[in-house]
Structure formats: C-alpha cells, structure tokens
Amino acid sequence: DTYPYADREAMAQWMARLNKEYPNFNTVGETWVTEPAYTAAWQKDSKLSNINSNLKSVMDFAFFDRINQAKNEETDGWWNGLNRVYNGLCYDYLYPNPASVMAFIENHDTDRFLGNGNDTLALKQALALLLTMNRIPQLYYGTEVLMNGTKEKTDGNVRKDFPGGFAGDKHNAFTVEG
C-alpha cells in the first residue's frame, strides 16, 4: 500500500540506479490495489504507464483478494469460487513479466488465511495453487504450523510470535514433537 505514495519519478530513478548497480537483486513494491491493470502499471517496462517504474516485482493483491473470497464459495458459476481466481489471472497479459509478480494468500497486514478457523483443505488447495502458478510465491511465517487469527481486534492477532524458541513457550514448532 505504500509504494505508490512516494514520488513516482524519483522512485523510478532510484530503481534504475539500484538495478544497474545490483542487476541480480530483486525489489518488490507493495501496491495494495486489487485490480491487475493498476498493479501492472507499476511493474518495470509496463506499457500502461508513461513512466517506467523500473520496479521488477509487484505484489498480486488481486490474487490475494480473489483466493480469500473463493475459499468461502462453491465453484458453481462463472464468477465465484476458483473461477474468481481464474478470471483474475486472465489479466496476466497486462504484466510485462507475470513470473516476477509476487503472489500470497496472507501477510502481516491481513487476516490469516485460516481466519479463526481451521479449514485445512482450503489452505492446502490455496497453497497448491500459490506454489504452482506463474508467480513468485510469498509464504508468511506460521502458515506451515496452521497459525490462525484475524485483525478484528488488533493486528497483533495475525503477528503472534512463531511458537517455540523461547523459554516458557508451551509449544515448540522448531522440534519434531512440536
């Protein structure tokens, strides 16, 4: 949500210099908008903007939004369930490089994918899609041990410490026993 807040021309110049100095370094810009056309305009070499951002990777909030709606829907029509995700991916042609778009199902600013529940089937399906689609997958810590929580009361509910590693922790996810 913050990348578009900065001076676009200054950021484009900064990214050009960074890319020249470190050509194998990747920078991801957070553009919290759920429409692919808007997000694609921020990716390097986009034809949708009159200023080349030189930003190699952008975050796929469209995928995040659609997969989180789809998890609560049946795929029984053209516009709901996994068809909702498919309909969003149809806009990949807008991105200069869809393989450099970073996709995710949750992060530190959102509810956990599991919310306050434990629907592991939906989580497994979402992760299977995330890890096999033409994107850079981003995994948020704790997903692998089924951490849940919502931002209903506080952001702290989705930013809890990973279980283990500190004296007094009831569970230690760093061990086989968990």
Model regions and ranges:
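Short glycine-/polar-rich loops that comprise or flank the Walker A/P-loop
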Residues: N134-I136
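Active-site-proximal helices and loops of the catalytic beta/alpha 8
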Residues: T2-N97, V101, N118-T120, A128-T132, ...
